[in-house]
Amino acid sequence: MGNSRSRVGRSFCSQFLPEEQAEIDQLFDALSSDKNSPNVSSKSFSLKALQNHVGEALPPEMVTRLYDGMRRVDLTGKAKGPSENVSQEQFTASMSHLLKGNSEEKSLMIMKMISATEGPVKAREVQKFTEDLVGSVVHVLSHRQELRGWTGKEAPGPNPRVQVLAAQLLSDMKLQDGKRLLGPQWLDYDCDRAVIEDWVFRVPHVAIFLSVVICKGFLILCSSLDLTTLVPERQVDQGRGFESILDVLSVMYINAQLPREQRHRWCLLFSSELHGHSFSQLCGHITHRGPCVAVLEDHDKHVFGGFASCSWEVKPQFQGDNRCFLFSICPSMAVYTHTGYNDHYMYLNHGQQTIPNGLGMGGQHNYFGLWVDVDFGKGHSRAKPTCTTYNSPQLSAQENFQFDKMEVWAVGDPSEEQLAKGNKSILDADPEAQALLEISGHSRHSEGLREVPDDE
């Protein structure tokens, strides 16, 4: 197998396998024979040809960025500026660097997609590139109908989650003096090749998003792109109409933090919109159901939550392990992992008089990093300055917050035990939920009306 030199010449060695290079060559032939570009040599293609091929699959500004990046590739080292059109060598080298290259090669292409001049670029230019890249991912997945059940962009105008995720990706960039790009005061700083290369190396989403944009935008080498662990399948039982707190960008960000074997599917266990504002319903739907993601939106529109690495159980002890984490989605995206200070990862309890009743993650009794009270709709996020378990700041707008929207999603494939529990009534599967319902004075209206399970 190995690398291919197919029709590329001696000055550049493509990193594509022969069958991949054949696809690249076929696309170049289609682009260079575009009938709407009569004045272009058959050995090159124009911006118009690329625009005609892509159509509406990518935003126009990303098509232009990709084209400019290609025509700025100088394989001889003698070019005095960008070429007028894109040659086959330039096209193959660009695709090879962007799809198969190492951090150095990818950073070279990113610099060329940002600026026509050699040398450092401003941080604000990198910010605009990153926002264009993130926005293009949502655009192309929506256009190709590959959102897997999640929403992309609903309201007209700029998508605020695009800017939030772009800011998160940029927050891991280290400037020359070691400072991080954490605010507008750094936007006039210079970013040289070393800064961009280090950023691409440490932030995998940059390379992944470039691959999505090119493979899905150009419809090239799609078999080499596995979207199943990038965008998990969204499952909501019985086809019920349901608008999640999360959009596809939020899900992609959280999903990337999960263990790999749990990234391909999210199944809705509980939604306050569908199941009501009830702590007993919450307990009944989420206990003994395996790893899951809980997310809520407070009255001030802050969106945050946590990942529980194992099944929730109602008991007075802390549970979970160091794979658990807390996260924020709005107003900023961030993940907060365990510190090793204590093992207070997860807590779920009710019906007790001397210890707290509710769902908590991190911190300690009455001082949780995230707390949902048994009086459903109330909670707290206490961190002065940070949560001891996860090093998270206050996640909610107010320390003591109120919320209307909460969701819990099971991630990955359920075990046979979890499937068996899922086929039973909530009250059969979780006697604790039944007890809580009775304690709260609610009768079981469905008692006597349900079908009897096979094992009874």
Curated annotation (Swiss-Prot):
<protein>
    <recommendedName>
        <fullName>MTOR-associated protein MEAK7</fullName>
    </recommendedName>
</protein>
<keyword id="KW-0472">Membrane</keyword>
<keyword id="KW-0449">Lipoprotein</keyword>
<dbReference type="Pfam" id="PF07534">
    <property type="entry name" value="TLD"/>
</dbReference>
<dbReference type="GO" id="GO:0031929">
    <property type="term" value="P:TOR signaling"/>
</dbReference>
<dbReference type="GO" id="GO:0031667">
    <property type="term" value="P:response to nutrient levels"/>
</dbReference>
<keyword id="KW-0519">Myristate</keyword>
<dbReference type="GO" id="GO:0043200">
    <property type="term" value="P:response to amino acid"/>
</dbReference>
<dbReference type="GO" id="GO:0032868">
    <property type="term" value="P:response to insulin"/>
</dbReference>
<keyword id="KW-0458">Lysosome</keyword>
<feature type="domain" description="TLDc">
    <location>
        <begin position="244"/>
        <end position="412"/>
    </location>
</feature>
<dbReference type="GO" id="GO:0150032">
    <property type="term" value="P:positive regulation of protein localization to lysosome"/>
</dbReference>
<comment type="subunit">
    <text>Interacts (via C-terminal domain) with MTOR and MLST8; the interaction with MTOR increases upon nutrient stimulation.</text>
</comment>
<keyword id="KW-0963">Cytoplasm</keyword>
<dbReference type="GO" id="GO:0005730">
    <property type="term" value="C:nucleolus"/>
</dbReference>
<dbReference type="GO" id="GO:0042127">
    <property type="term" value="P:regulation of cell population proliferation"/>
</dbReference>
<dbReference type="GO" id="GO:0005654">
    <property type="term" value="C:nucleoplasm"/>
</dbReference>
<dbReference type="GO" id="GO:0006979">
    <property type="term" value="P:response to oxidative stress"/>
</dbReference>
<dbReference type="GO" id="GO:0005634">
    <property type="term" value="C:nucleus"/>
</dbReference>
<dbReference type="GO" id="GO:0030334">
    <property type="term" value="P:regulation of cell migration"/>
</dbReference>
<comment type="function">
    <text>Activates an alternative mTOR signaling through RPS6KB2 activation and EIF4EBP1 repression to regulate cell proliferation and migration. Recruits MTOR at the lysosome, essential for MTOR signaling at the lysosome.</text>
</comment>
<dbReference type="GO" id="GO:0005765">
    <property type="term" value="C:lysosomal membrane"/>
</dbReference>
<dbReference type="InterPro" id="IPR006571">
    <property type="entry name" value="TLDc_dom"/>
</dbReference>
<dbReference type="GO" id="GO:0005737">
    <property type="term" value="C:cytoplasm"/>
</dbReference>
<dbReference type="GO" id="GO:1900408">
    <property type="term" value="P:negative regulation of cellular response to oxidative stress"/>
</dbReference>
<dbReference type="GO" id="GO:0005829">
    <property type="term" value="C:cytosol"/>
</dbReference>
<dbReference type="GO" id="GO:0016020">
    <property type="term" value="C:membrane"/>
</dbReference>
<feature type="lipid moiety-binding region" description="N-myristoyl glycine">
    <location>
        <position position="2"/>
    </location>
</feature>
